[in-house]
Amino acid sequence: MISEVVVTTRKNNRDNKAPIGVYFKDKKVIMHLFSGSHTYENLLTEDYFSVNVVPPIEIAKAVLDDEDDYLYYNDIPYLKSSYYAIFYKVIERKFVDREDKFGKNRLMILEGEEIKRIYLNNIPKPYNRADGLLVEIAVIYSRLANKNIKINEDDKKEMINDIRKYFSIIKKVGGREHKQLAEIMLRNLNLL
């Protein structure tokens, strides 16, 4: 099962966060990082990172920029908005060239071993349908906005139609912040 989280890294005193789908397996985590992303570049050389289990809206925010309220455990950044953060040491990096409908890309398959967990006192909010739709828009946005990913026109049209459909539902059922984040992504893609 893929779990949607926010991964945080630090390199040259700069914090980075990215929404990433990860696989949890006992005390280990596995993630696939695409060449060209800041997280990929950071974890080529950095050996520590955190996986932040956060509200869905924080996953969408993470696709837009790195600004956030960071806390630190042994200089490893994690998010103040997390329900909990898990800290990992990289134990393996594998590199593969992958070709799919998004084109050719270099992929780092990274495995980390858990070294610490911190639970924060953030109380979960009730789930809203806009939460899941906003995460889906963020996933599609991350692909459409990445200049390293080549998408054929038919797939691109389908993705844009999906974003518009999800946005129409968010406008009906979501809160102000859901709508604002979705609007930013649509504007960045010149869809508004």
Curated annotation (Swiss-Prot):
Domain of life: Archaea
Gene3D superfamilies documented for this protein: Electron Transport, Fmn-binding Protein, Chain A, Hypothetical membrane protein ta0354_69_121
InterPro entries (alphabetical): DUF447_C, DUF447_N, Split_barrel_FMN-bd, UCP018747
Pfam families the record matches: DUF447_C, DUF447_N
Family according to the record: To M.thermoautotrophicum MTH863.
The name this protein goes by in its record: Uncharacterized protein MJ1453
Lineage: Archaea, Methanobacteriati, Methanobacteriota, Methanomada group, Methanococci
